[in-house]
Amino acid sequence: MTLSSQHYLVITALGADRPGIVNTITRHVSSCGCNIEDSRLAMLGEEFTFIMLLSGSWNAITLIESTLPLKGAELDLLIVMKRTTARPRPPMPASVWVQVDVADSPHLIERFTALFDAHHMNIAELVSRTQPAENERAAQLHIQITAHSPASADAANIEQAFKALCTELNAQGSINVVNYSQHDEQDGVK
């Protein structure tokens, strides 16, 4: 199937976790003739969320759009769907990965996302988990962020700002910046 004849749909399914639920959803997607291009699954409390980017012919996408709400009701799932298009990813010459461990309190995740925003970086992935307080230890927040920068300079400048924010918040943090143009030159690719 040519790219122009492909159609795309983003689906989010949210509901109580139980054995076999993800298989039931993916089997329904396949039975409609759709392909799962990309997906993410997360457990949040007793709920799960399953996000998928589907591709297929116009007929396949229309079939999943018309049948998934019924399947969702049958499985007691909240289903959200939105048509989208394929687009080439713009070049991102630098990527940044950070991990942070800090005593939990409100606004911490916002502080780190604001840091990336101030450096014009696109957050591609954000994972956070809170460990409950135990004995004498306060609740701990663990944050992982992956971000991409359209400008190498923004990625280089974020290192010092990240370290300063970790110091201000009394957080333990690590940052890894990869500048792909430098990385390629080291590997002999220009």
UniProtKB/Swiss-Prot annotation:
Presence of keyword Transcription regulation: yes
Compartments where found: Cytoplasm
InterPro entries named among the record's database cross-references: ACT-like_dom_sf (IPR045865), ACT_dom (IPR002912), GcvR (IPR016867), UPF0237/GcvR_regulator (IPR050990)
GO biological process terms held by the UniProt record: DNA-templated transcription; regulation of DNA-templated transcription
Annotated ranges, domain ACT: 10-91, 97-176
NCBIfam families in the record: PRK11589.1
Name this polypeptide is given: Glycine cleavage system transcriptional repressor
The species this protein was found in: Escherichia coli (strain K12)
